[in-house]
A protein has these predicted regions:
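Membrane-interfacial amphipathic helices and adjacent loop/beta segments
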Residues: 1-10
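Non-catalytic C-terminal accessory region of glycerolipid acyltransferases
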Residues: 10-143
């Protein structure tokens, strides 16, 4: 089943946990920042520049105690090839070093994405200026 999530609420997290425990996969687009700008992004090096990536997949995997895999699809010689790879069995985010640990996971993902972008640079699509300034959380209007 397809579940589009724009915000992780406790109800959504419980639903995702049930899906994982029943053997289903949860796919998160790792090269996009959150729809609602909540500031949960991490700036890391990507293709020679700094770029913001979401922290959400790693925080969620840490809370749900589930592994992370990556999935890339490249068209090579007229045939689509899927690359499904183990990323981490467990995401550990220690309280004292949480920001550093998140940065390490996000950088590892950016490095892996970069590898596939270098293999097929015209097959990575984004529809906004990817290498912009760091993402700032949305400000709630004051009353």
């Amino acid at each position: 089943s397809l579940l589009q999530v724009t915000e992780i609420s406790p109800a959504v997290a419980i639903s995702l946990d049930h899906k994982i425990k029943s053997g289903e996969f949860v796919f998160i687009v790792g090269d996009r920042i959150p729809v609602r700008n909540n500031g949960r992004t991490q700036e890391v090096s990507f293709l020679g520049e700094n770029a913001s990536f979401s922290q959400g997949p790693y925080i969620l995997a840490s809370l749900l105690k589930c592994p992370i895999y990556t999935l890339f699809c490249l068209k090579e010689s007229g045939t689509y090839h899927l690359y499904f790879e183990h990323f981490s069995e467990k995401i550990h985010l220690p309280r004292k070093d949480r920001e550093h640990a998140l940065r390490e996971y996000v950088q590892r993902f950016a490095d892996r994405l970069q590898k596939y972008c270098m293999m097929a640079p015209l097959q990575w699509f984004n529809f906004y200026f990817f290498w912009s300034t760091p993402v700032e959380p949305e400000q709630k209007p004051s009353s």
